[in-house]
Amino acid sequence: MVAKQESVVAPQVDVSKWSGKELELGKKVNEYAKSLATFKYPFFIPPPYPPAKPNMALSTQVNKMKQTANEAFKRKKYEEAKKLYGLALQLALNRCTWEPSILTREEASVMLCNRAAAEIALSQFPEALADANAALKIRNNYGKCYYRKAKALEAMHRIEEAKQVVRDGLILAEPVTRNELVALWASYTEKD
């Protein structure tokens, strides 16, 4: 659908009562105003572009790769799951810059968080911590990431840091993603 262009009417200045320099200046102003009226975009400023639509084919590929990785994780094929989450992350990060960045952030944070889960299952705790940290930098209200970060810290015997991560998660995480954090906090308070 082509946008309808409205015609711009150049204002007219009555210069019949002017003399000398005023007359010359008035004519120049009139000529300039008329010339602007002929431009498609006055002052050479085009209208804003419509919002970009996300590449749905890429979203489909990312989701299929994530589902395949989730299935591998359920079958306890953690190395395969880690690799597939990494590939899905690469796909998500290959979005064009004009696409909505919120979609890239959402997909990337989920892939990093899921890869952290696979790394925890593989006892690759520093890698899991790095992925959880990266996911939280992208999306700081993602409760599962706080949980995974705390579990990685706990596995590395950094209990006080893990407790602080759980506290932070309980404050910052979305309510729907807090359940695991509540259970983890309960387990920490029972030990004390």
From Swiss-Prot:
Alphabetical keyword list: Cytoplasm, Nucleus, Protein transport, Transport
- Taxonomically, which superkingdom? Eukaryota
GO CC terms of this entry: cytosol; nucleus; Sec62/Sec63 complex
For the keyword Nucleus, the answer is yes
Q: Where in the cell is it found?
A: Cytoplasm; Nucleus
Major localisation: cytoplasm
Q: Which SMART domains match?
A: TPR
User: Does the UniProt entry include the keyword Protease?
Assistant: no
Could you tell me the Gene Ontology terms of the biological process aspect for this record?
post-translational protein targeting to endoplasmic reticulum membrane; protein folding; protein transport
What GO molecular function annotation could you give as one example from this UniProt entry? Hsp70 protein binding
**Coiled-coil intervals, chain numbering:** none
Q: How does it assemble?
A: Component of the heterotetrameric Sec62/63complex composed of sec62, sec63, sec66 and sec72. The Sec62/63 complex associates with the Sec61 complex to form the Sec complex.
> Any idea what job this protein has?
Acts as a non-essential component of the Sec62/63 complex which is involved in SRP-independent post-translational translocation across the endoplasmic reticulum (ER) and functions together with the Sec61 complex and bip1 in a channel-forming translocon complex. A cycle of assembly and disassembly of Sec62/63 complex from sec61 may govern the activity of the translocon.
Protein's UniProt name: ER protein translocation subcomplex subunit sec67
At the highest ranks, the source species' classification is: Eukaryota, Fungi, Dikarya, Ascomycota, Taphrinomycotina
Q: Which gene encodes it?
A: sec67
